């Protein structure tokens, strides 16, 4: 279903916040004796023993042959909860692409501190799957904690990894046991399959995940009609102090003026839709002051010369450098032609990252071929590589670092989960990728990007990706791109990666569904993407705010509750700017502490000012008002 929108539209508050009219899923607070948890649909979140989170999330995952998640539809849902226990019984079906799976689920919590989750399902037709079953997310704050697992071969003692582990830290798990910071103990037992753990920080999830069906077993696996799957996970907690009383205090955000780093160069991706920037786009984007435009260039495909010429023109119009991610053909085919084209360019080339066709990680031969081609053309530009995919691939590779001046990897927060809360959780894990990457690459330039809400492509697909159904968005597009949530996520990401020491960042694209401004030449819209031609997205204003401090510093910020409020603090001389972002759908009261600050003003981008900011960006950016002692962030 498509519709035509030619000018500003007054969307609902929910659409402005997170891209759809429907309210966020209802949450229920539950207790099982000393354990507490939050129920959301068929998932348990934030299972705590006292004040200590022992399970970040417990959920059932149905993944198709390309690792796409097939979401459940509940056929029956019954919750009975008391003061010290609860029982959830439900029936669900997961239907999508080739997958057709129906299952009965139960999650039961008892006063003795035990939560048991059971899955009993059946395939309703033949299909290929990579995974079906419960997943347990252990919080990343367990890094360095000793744990003991039961396996078929006996007890094994190990640790939750500190630096991000490229491979599984625990195998063949029947149970895992560890202490909590408060002095309690948690034991998690697994039945119905073989289980192992992976370090999900590789994909910026803020967790370690225990899952069923070890990856050493070839996949995808065919389920035949009538095949059954049964699993059970049991969480037991005991000991430790009771939880602290709930506080009605504001979320406290504290800026540390004594710890800072230079604001990293921040660029944008060249728009993948291919349409050139209009004069109006260029005028708006000059306020964002992108340090560079990143151009993915497949030298094996026809037309790359025209795309390079267009990107060069756009970079020049924006006073930006050009960064190139080049995929060369067999034996470096295309590299000499690329070098010749760049030697005629009149814009600065920030870096060239090179890969061989069909490869996700840079190899030694393509680097050597690039240096030979560029040397022959008399070009002297930084040459590097890394991975076109996630930090995982970088972490698992043996890189020819001696031949690299820059090392890169990408980030998107939706490899495993897609809800707002999970996306917000990833912000705490982004710095961990920088810390672990720095241990690999040393003092070489570490560049992160593209950083997008959805992946530009699926690097883990084992078959052809299905085309979107009519009225649906492509897998590369997120309906939250033009929303306030995306702006908050962006501010939190720049804070996380900038303070962690990334040397350069690339976010989103210039225009279009993956950009910071909507296209002006494309009035026919998919109704699930709420925009109008030329609309300025909230992420634009975050980047424009940062651009005004591009020669300054980024300051450390203590987030009192990062799931509710994200922040970014910038300083340039005597000027200080703090961006606060409410990551929820409710008003949050914030106590902002900035030692030595005075004479403050504020500008608020919320559901009330959204349309003005989107249609009259210059007028919106010129507005401000005095800032009080405490801020209610809408």
Q: Which positions does each model-derived feature cover?
A:
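Polysaccharide-binding surfaces and accessory modules of carbohydrate-active proteins
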Residues: 108, 112-193, 598-621
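C-terminal beta-strand-rich structural cap/linker in extracellular carbohydrate-active enzymes
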Residues: 617-634
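Aromatic/acidic polysaccharide-binding cleft in carbohydrate-active enzymes
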Residues: 226, 449-538, 558-563
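Carbohydrate-binding surface patches
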Residues: 560-597, 602-607
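Beta-strand-rich recognition/accessory modules
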Residues: 17, 31, 56-66, 93-97, ...
């Amino acid at each position: 279903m498509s519709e035509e929108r030619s000018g500003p539209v007054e969307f609902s508050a929910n659409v402005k916040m997170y891209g759809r009219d429907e309210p966020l899923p209802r949450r229920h607070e539950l207790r099982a004796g000393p354990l507490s948890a939050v129920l959301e649909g068929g998932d348990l979140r934030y299972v705590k023993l006292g004040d200590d989170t022992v399970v970040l999330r417990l959920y059932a995952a149905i993944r198709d042959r390309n690792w796409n998640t097939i979401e459940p539809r509940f056929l029956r849902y019954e919750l009975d909860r008391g003061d010290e226990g609860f029982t959830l019984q439900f029936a669900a079906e997961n239907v999508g692409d080739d997958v057709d799976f129906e299952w009965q689920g139960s999650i039961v919590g008892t006063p003795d501190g035990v939560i048991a989750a059971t899955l009993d399902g059946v395939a309703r037709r033949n299909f290929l799957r990579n995974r079906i079953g419960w997943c347990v997310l252990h919080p990343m704050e367990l890094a360095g904690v000793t744990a003991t697992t039961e396996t078929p071969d006996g007890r094994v003692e190990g640790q939750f990894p500190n630096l991000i582990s490229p491979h599984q830290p625990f195998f063949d798990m029947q149970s895992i046991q560890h202490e909590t910071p408060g002095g309690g103990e948690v034991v998690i037992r697994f039945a119905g399959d073989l289980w192992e753990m992976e370090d999900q920080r590789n994909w910026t999830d803020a967790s370690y995940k225990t899952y069923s069906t070890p990856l050493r077993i070839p996949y995808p696996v065919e389920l035949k009609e009538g095949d059954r799957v049964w699993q059970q996970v049991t969480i037991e907690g005991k000991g430790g102090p009771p939880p602290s009383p709930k506080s009605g205090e504001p979320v406290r955000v504290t800026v540390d003026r004594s710890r800072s780093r230079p604001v990293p160069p921040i660029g944008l991706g060249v728009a993948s839709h291919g349409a050139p920037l209009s004069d109006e786009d260029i005028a708006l984007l000059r306020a964002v002051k992108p340090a560079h435009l990143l151009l993915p260039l497949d030298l094996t495909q026809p037309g790359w010369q025209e795309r390079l010429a267009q990107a060069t023109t756009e970079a020049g119009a924006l006073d930006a450098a050009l960064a190139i991610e080049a995929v060369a053909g067999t034996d470096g085919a295309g590299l000499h032609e690329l070098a010749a084209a760049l030697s005629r360019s009149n814009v600065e080339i920030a870096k060239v990252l090179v890969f061989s066709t069909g490869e996700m990680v840079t190899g030694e031969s393509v680097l050597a071929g690039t240096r030979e081609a560029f040397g022959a053309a008399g070009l002297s530009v930084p040459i590097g590589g890394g991975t076109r995919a996630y930090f995982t691939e970088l972490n698992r590779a043996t890189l020819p670092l001696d031949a690299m001046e820059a090392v890169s990897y990408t980030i998107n927060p939706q490899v495993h989960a897609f809800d707002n809360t999970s996306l917000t959780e990833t912000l705490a894990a982004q710095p961990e990728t920088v810390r672990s990457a720095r241990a690999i690459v040393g003092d070489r330039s570490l560049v992160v990007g593209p950083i997008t809400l959805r992946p530009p492509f699926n690097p883990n697909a084992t078959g052809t990706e299905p085309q979107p159904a009519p009225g649906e968005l492509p897998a590369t597009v997120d309906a939250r791109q033009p929303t306030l949530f995306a702006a908050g996520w962006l501010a939190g990401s720049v804070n996380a990666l900038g303070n962690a020491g990334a040397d350069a960042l690339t976010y989103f694209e210039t225009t279009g569904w993956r950009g910071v401004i909507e296209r002006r030449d494309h009035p026919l819209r998919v109704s699930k993407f709420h925009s109008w031609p030329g609309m300025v997205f909230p992420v634009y204003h975050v980047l424009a705010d940062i651009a005004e401090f591009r020669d300054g510093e980024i300051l450390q910020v203590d987030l009192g509750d990062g799931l509710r409020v994200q922040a970014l603090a910038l300083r340039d001389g005597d000027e200080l700017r703090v961006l606060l972002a409410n990551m929820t759908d409710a008003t949050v009261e914030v106590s902002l502490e900035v030692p030595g600050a005075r004479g403050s003003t504020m500008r608020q981008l919320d559901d009330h000012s959204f349309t003005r900011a989107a249609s009259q960006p210059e007028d919106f950016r010129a507005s401000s008002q005095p800032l009080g002692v405490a801020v209610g962030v809408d």
